[in-house]
Amino acid sequence: MFTEDRELIDRSFKFLLASRALRSVALILVNLSLSLYLKALGYGLIFIGIVYFFIVLFNVLITFTLGTIGDRIGYARTLLIAEFLPLIALFGLAISENVRVIIASAMLGGITGSPGGIRGAFSPGMTSYIASNWPDERERVEKLSKIYATASFAAIGGSFLLATHGYLSHYFGTINSFRILFGISFILTLGSLISLSFLKETKRPKKTTRLMKKESFSYSLRVMIPNIINGSGTGIAFPLLPLWFELMYRISASYVGAVFTVAYAFTAAGSYFSGAFLNAKNIRAITVSSLARILQGLMLIAIAFTPLLFLSVILYSIRSFIAGIGTPMRSAINVRGISGEDYGTASAVQGIFTRSSQLTSGLSGYLMSEALDLPLVTGGFLQVAGALAFYWLIRSWEKKHNF
């Protein structure tokens, strides 16, 4: 997988895009479906929230393990190893409706319930792979924007498949229809795994520390602190968001899929806009990405108090467009001050704190059982606070380093 031929590395990028597209369809489908599936099986909100707590907890361990070995064995190999986990998980979900198998599979596959359009883009080693092979920040943002736009556009396929659930239910029943969809996700993830086997990457610099350099850790702290705040909000607001739409507006799983289909189209447009326009102009990335996150939080709060479904869909779609703009820039900023030999470990450590903060997903079901709007309002306020902290910490680093 290692090569010094830049042309080969650049040409292999298309296989990463293909992988992210297939992975996005599969994981968006299962992330949107899991809470609805558990509810259809008869489990309550508090139980579902607790399930997500353990899913996130296990995902923390996986993120750290795969991230740290990536600095030593290469990020393309890390991506390949990481893809085996959801493949096994989706097989388990497809063949059994036993709750123990469902929980174990969801934990192994990292099915955290996040319904964001770029969910399929992320796996351990992805950001590190981009940072390692394209050191120029503008080029990184361009590559990340293409990945996020591709994943978001492909996510429409995942939400569309969920929208077919109502049709399938007429023939196979509610539960078996979910399992059929999980089987389709398994096949798509297998395609993603095959695509990743064609990736090429530049040879890794020799690792000189057991964990990471002091300057890399110092910069990572500036990323981790706001990510803890934001991750707490994400954990509270998003795992049960598809279920929130179902309960708030009394719509079926098929209609939930339609809602997110619209939102993912807007996320894809935002990611394309970020890479094609904002990255080409003299715009400060930290300002744009922080403002985008603030607006995301405020709009989440507004959605919580929206009584009409069509208004909620409009607000969530606009929020998704804004998320598409900010995410590629934030991803590039996260590795800006990291040494080349520490990309994987730094991303893993940052991911640990972000994922750990999302253990608040255990509160999501409890808050929703008390009042439907509580998870969204709480999560929205935390996103705003996290964005303000991110801007202050990164901007102070930029000033110190005349960036």
Q: Can you describe what each PLM-predicted range is?
A:
Residues R77-G92, T287-I301, G380:
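Structural signature of the two symmetry-related core transmembrane helices
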